[in-house]
Structures are given as C-alpha cells and as structure tokens.
C-alpha cells in the first residue's frame, strides 16, 4: 500500500490558494484522510433501489381502489408493471454488484451503463447526506465503483490514445515525475485548471481513454460529464495541505492505470484486456 495513505492533513489557510469551483465553500478546516471502499456507494445504491421499489408498491396499493373504477383489470396491470420494475432493478443491481467486485462485464447490455449510473449517483448523494455521510466520502466510493466498471467494460483497442489530465495544484516534484512517464508510455499529459479547460483538451486531443487526477469532487463532475463517451478512470489526489495546494498522487496507482490501457513496455504482448 502506498505511503501516501499515512499522510495526515495539516491546518490550512483559505487565502493562500486559488480554490476551484468545487471548493468555494471550503472554510480551511482540516480534511480527514478518506479511506472508503466501493461498498459505501453500493450500500446506498441498494438503499435507493429499495426505497424506489417500496414507493411504487405503496403508491399502487393506495390508488388501486380508484384504478378499478376506471377499468376492472387496471390494478392487475399496474401490479404487473411494478413487479417487472422491481425485477429489473434487482437484476440490474446484481449486475452492478458483481461487475464492480469481479471487474468483469456482467451487464446484459455490454456497454457502460452511464445513464443509469448517473441517475443512481444523484439519488445516492441525497440519501447519504441524510445519514451524515460527506459528499467527499461518497464521491471517493463512487469513483472506485466507476473505475471498476470502466475496467470491466473496456473494449480491446490496439491503438489506444490515452490522455492523462492533471490538476495544477500538484507539487512540482510530483508533476515532473508524471511528465517523465511520457518518455516511457505513449500517452498525452496535460495540466488543467478546471472542468472547462479539461473538456476543451478532451475535444482537442480526442482520446479513446482518459485518466484523471483530481479531488473527488472534480473527478465525479468529470465522470458524470464525459464518462458515457469513452473509458474514464479517476485517481483521487492526496491533499496534505488541504484542497488546491501542493497535492500529491499515488504514482504507483497512476502508472498501473497507464499500463492497463497501453500495456507494460517490458511486455510486448500489448495492453491489458480483460
């Protein structure tokens, strides 16, 4: 495990940095080191699905007496629709669960389920907030689930064009080490100051895959924005001095992700394909 996991954050000053749009409300309070897994997002996802199923059951139960006044068979038809909805959502959740933990594509429709995933994220954040779970914790777990799905649904591509997007808040030492990867791997590396510039770079370079390094908030926004167009893997940065200043990244994780797309230069067999 990377030594970065042991870093503890220090007190920080709001005025000594240029905060990104996602951190405008930050008050300088120390951040806790985020240590959550995929299970947090999946647990609240299950909660969202169960609540939606229960809501429909209660709704149809309450309006059935009125439905029968319009057409005698209408309540039966409504219950059949509810049953099918529950069956589909249960089956889809099982697909999501198995795909995430096995990192193999178990979805009936093999493409990345971006639309359903997007709908689920919005509901999960609302539910998690009610239970006092921070947006950053949910975001971190969401990114890990999204990464697993990206790996599982990745299609073989011998001419992979990988774009690595970096935040400008990385330390110079860290940035230099990442730039050195360009001498080893066939990748494009760009530093961007925000989502608008990131989208501009994506349109300009037209990659087949994107590796993003950023805080959870920016990663979630980016995945939701372009995750349905091509493969995206996000790597949360490490913020020993708070957000948007002298951040780090797990270089081992970043290099492993690059190898996932373009392969290991020591291995001429090509990119890693599940």
Short names for language-model regions:
Residues 20, 76-177:
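N-terminal topogenic membrane-targeting module
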Residues 149, 186-201:
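A short, well-structured beta->alpha microelement
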Residues 232-270:
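Ser/Thr/Gly-rich flexible loops in soluble cytosolic domains mediating phosphotransfer, phosphorylation
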Residues 206-208:
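Proline-aspartate-enriched helix->loop->beta-strand connector
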Residues 201, 220-225, 241-248:
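Short, charged, surface-exposed secondary-structure boundary motifs
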